[in-house]
């Protein structure tokens, strides 16, 4: 799975996230995570946390 900057992904937790920084492609990303309680949290996620890419950025 090739994740790019600004892609929207679904996490294995069921939450969605927008990629805001790529630390190492295929390994680790900074993401704005839409939490199930309605809040948004910026956190580091790993490739294995991602279930599927929902949208790809146009960049």
Each PLM stretch: what is its role?
Residues 2-47, 51:
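Basic/aromatic-rich interaction segments and small domains that mediate binding to polyanionic partners
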Residues 50-59:
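Intrinsically disordered, low-complexity linker and terminal regions at domain boundaries
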């Amino acid at each position: 799975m090739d994740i790019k900057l600004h892609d929207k992904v679904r996490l294995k937790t069921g939450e969605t996230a927008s990629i805001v920084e790529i630390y190492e492609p295929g390994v680790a990303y900074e993401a704005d995570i839409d939490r199930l309680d309605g809040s948004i949290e910026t956190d580091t996620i790993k490739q294995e946390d991602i279930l599927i890419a929902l949208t790809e950025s146009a960049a």
